[in-house]
Curated annotation (Swiss-Prot):
HAMAP family hit by this protein: Salvage_MtnC
Protein name per Swiss-Prot or TrEMBL: Enolase-phosphatase E1
EC top class named in words: hydrolase
UniProt source species: Xanthomonas campestris pv. campestris (strain B100)
Family per record: Belongs to the HAD-like hydrolase superfamily. MasA/MtnC family.
Taxonomy of the source species: Bacteria, Pseudomonadati, Pseudomonadota, Gammaproteobacteria, Lysobacterales
Length: 232
């Protein structure tokens, strides 16, 4: 098999630890959400996303109710585009004040840099908003890696467990789906990408999944425990 013409990667559980997102980013956004909405709720960009939350609830509600709803969605790990956008805005403050830096596995950072040097275009597809993705890579504990990525995709392109989303990405980057390798730790996402025609590899990191996924669960996806084990 020839080397892929492009590599598309997830973030959480793939390039980076699940615990960083769950234990650092989510709690930070939850704590900061009330003050952020009260202070910036009048800004058009922030209000746009708050209105989407209100539409989801189906009521004309005060901001205090929206704040409670957003905090509940964080607790539930809801993949709502408005929540992800607002979280990204809050995290931007955290990155810029150096409250934290984004975790990137060393093997992922090294391999992403190597692929970029070899001329393989790299793309990111995550449930986090595109601005949040860019901040994540720009403020990683391996340095600014944002320049390695050719383009970014979030749930505005479609849900990650639907094959149509991966077809749209292939169309947008102008690479045939069979020439794209998608990396993720979520089997349902890999299944969707494979249905769209992409090559797939499951990141089954022991740090995130102490019990390896079974062969039946992995199916036809390549299974690796780090980027260094990937066969292109």
């Amino acid at each position: 098999m020839t080397r892929p013409q492009a590599i598309l990667t997830d973030i959480e559980g793939t390039t980076s630890s699940i615990s960083f997102v769950k234990d650092v980013l989510f709690p930070y956004a939850r704590r900061a959400m009330p003050a952020y909405v009260r202070e910036h709720g009048g800004h058009p960009q922030v209000r746009h996303w708050l209105n989407q939350v209100a539409d989801e609830i189906g009521e004309d509600v005060p901001d205090e109710v929206l704040i409670t709803t957003l905090q509940t969605w964080i607790d539930e790990d809801r993949k709502h585009t408005a929540l992800k956008a607002l979280q990204g805005m809050i995290w931007e403050d955290g990155y810029r004040t150096a409250d934290f830096s984004a975790h990137i596995y060393a093997d992922a950072a090294i391999q992403l840099q190597a692929w970029h040097a070899e001329g393989i275009p790299l793309y990111v597809y995550s449930s986090g908003s595109v601005p949040a993705q860019k901040l994540f890579f720009a403020h990683s504990d391996a340095g600014d890696l944002s320049g390695l990525v050719s383009d970014w995709f979030d749930t505005e392109v479609g849900p990650k467990r639907e094959s149509s989303s991966y077809r749209r990405i292939a169309e947008r980057i102008g690479v045939p789906a069979p020439e794209i390798l998608f990396l993720s730790d979520v089997i349902e996402e890999l299944d969707a990408a494979k249905r769209a025609g992409m090559r797939t590899a499951l990141l089954d990191r022991l740090e995130d999944y102490p019990t390896p996924r079974s062969a039946d669960d992995v199916g036809s996806h390549q299974r690796v425990e780090s980027f260094t084990q990937l066969v292109l």
